[in-house]
Amino acid sequence: MKYFKKLVGERIYLSPRNSEDVEQFTEWLNDFNTTDYIGRSGASVTLDTEKEYLSRVSKDTATFVIITLEDNKMIGTVSLEQIDDINRNATLGIFIGDKDYRDNGYGAEAIRLILEYGFRYLNLHNIKLDLMEFNERALKCYKKCGFQENGRRRKCKFINGKYYDSISMDILAEEFTGDFIKIRLLSFVTITFDILFCSVFFRPVPPAFTTISVVTSRPPFT
């Protein structure tokens, strides 16, 4: 299956989702070990419902599959949903469907790539997410990526015979760009106010600067 290196990290890249991926996603979304952690255990997912979901959300969603660079294997998905162009916010969704790739840092890398895409290219200001209170690994990962807890809805999800809280978290553009800008500033030998201004506020770089090459510690977008 053909994938495209839209956003490239150290071990993974994000590619636009193909319609051919539906069968694999349907298998993942019928596994309670996956759906319990994303709050979708009560849903009955078929090939038809997954195809309908994909066509419906594509209008206001940036959805990517997570592909390993080493062997070009699809291991999960990450997305920015409910993108609000006026208020510049969106909701992040992610899951690693392939169990062999969980707890190995692939999710955190995918989150950093999608955040950089959302803040740097979509000009978003606030990105939020929700998770179940028992998903301690995800909570630790989100905090590591810069998300802050901003509230919880008590006992709103019924999973496997018990009610659980849903935790809400978010991150602002300026909170994410702290480390992002530091990495890039250390790479400049000289810097002008214009370049700094464009980097901080994520505005398009004027034509005069389009030939500037910036060497960073991260792989470039391709």
Model-derived features with residue positions:
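A short, well-structured alpha-helix characteristic of acyl/acetyltransferase catalytic modules
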Residues: 1-51, 175-182
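Glycine-rich phosphate/pyrophosphate-binding loop shared by adenosine-nucleotide-utilizing enzymes
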Residues: 12, 73-76, 164
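Acetyl-CoA-dependent GNAT
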Residues: 43-101, 172-176, 181
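Conserved acetyl-CoA-binding loop-helix of GNAT-fold acetyltransferases
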Residues: 103-117, 139-144
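Short amphipathic, helix-prone segments within low-complexity/disordered or flexible regions
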Residues: 185-189, 194, 200-220
